[in-house]
């Protein structure tokens, strides 16, 4: 069922759209005509493709309270996993009371493949996009991926009211 939310205070709003026939969710800034209420969302091939080159991807295995990384572009500090470079990342496993944070300055797309992920957090959103040009998350076929947060998480800098939060273009695709 498609849904959207839009602010009436400005012409630039945040919209989330779900297309059940292709399992695509896109969150992006769009322009609306408040008089007409029209919303325009454009998806490109990068937003809808679920394929990736596994040999070029960094692997992140969540291990309850930390993570093991094979590849580059990732830092791990306890239960906080931070993606720091554009590229492709395959994530699997369970992270208890931690978060996956995307903090990439500059150009390029961050492609994240969720391959059986379960992340919980009592202190912050378990999936945060702080900075990136674009993030595309693919839900691997046949997997269950879960992000669970506390009722409302607050850090020194941010107040998160959702399990998944983004300050950049964020697209979900796939059938997992």
Question: Where do the PLM segments sit?
Answer:
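A composition-driven surface/loop motif
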Residues: 1-176
